[in-house]
């Protein structure tokens, strides 16, 4: 059976769908209802209303997982209490989000960080966030004319990142795919450049 049931806070209102389901579980199936975990909504930064794909104010899940590594999506969702409203910004703040995750991955500050890191990476066979800051990859990738092979070579020649490239080349290549898609679809013009 199901032990825990997360759902949007609108389903947690008195007399809402959770209360109805709880009665059905008890009176029809003679089972205990799952433990409820209501969560708040995700808004786009600057919006006061929850995202809604039907109203054109949302970001669809497919786009999010195409632009962000799965461990970062989990980090975004799990780093705060489910009761806290989250604000998603696919532009500038996305770079900071990936960099924050990478920093926590490299140097967890406490047991809570270690637990969060486990939850973000559990079951992922191929990590997609390297030890090189995403912000640096965004710049390096564009400086290398958006060529993954050239970007890796530039990073390898850097005294700061050579060892990381040797240890994490496959992860870096995978992460550069996210960089490329983000630059193409969501990056603000202020972060884009082209060398002539």
Task: Mark where each language-model region is.
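Short, well-ordered coil loops that connect the C-terminus of an alpha-helix to the N-terminus
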Residues: 30-31, 70
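Catalytic adenosine-cofactor/nucleotide-binding cores of aminoacyl-tRNA synthetases and other
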Residues: 13, 18, 25, 40-186
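Divalent-metal (Mg2+/Mn2+/Ca2+)-assisted nucleotide/phosphate chemistry catalytic cores
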Residues: 1-22, 28-29
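Extended, charged low-complexity segments
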Residues: 190-192
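Glycine-rich phosphate/pyrophosphate-binding loops
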Residues: 31-43
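C-terminal accessory/binding modules appended to enzymatic or scaffolding proteins
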Residues: 195-196
């Amino acid at each position: 059976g199901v032990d825990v049931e997360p759902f949007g806070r609108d389903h947690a209102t008195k007399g809402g769908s959770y209360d109805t389901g709880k009665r059905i579980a008890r009176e029809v199936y003679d089972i205990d209802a799952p433990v409820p975990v209501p969560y708040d909504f995700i808004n786009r930064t600057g919006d006061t209303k929850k995202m809604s794909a039907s109203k054109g104010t949302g970001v669809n899940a497919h786009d999010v997982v195409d632009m962000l590594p799965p461990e970062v999506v989990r980090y975004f969702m799990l780093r705060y209490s489910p009761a806290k409203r989250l604000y998603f910004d696919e532009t500038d703040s996305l770079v900071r989000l990936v960099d924050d995750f990478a920093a926590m991955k490299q140097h967890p500050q406490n047991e809570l960080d270690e637990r969060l890191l486990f939850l973000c990476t559990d079951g992922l066979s191929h990590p997609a966030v390297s030890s090189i800051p995403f912000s640096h990859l965004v710049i390096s990738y564009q400086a290398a004319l958006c060529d993954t092979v050239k970007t890796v070579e530039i990073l390898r020649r850097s005294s700061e990142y050579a060892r990381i490239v040797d240890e994490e080349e496959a992860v870096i290549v995978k992460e550069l795919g996210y960089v490329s898609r983000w630059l193409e679809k969501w990056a603000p013009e202020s972060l884009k450049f082209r060398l002539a």
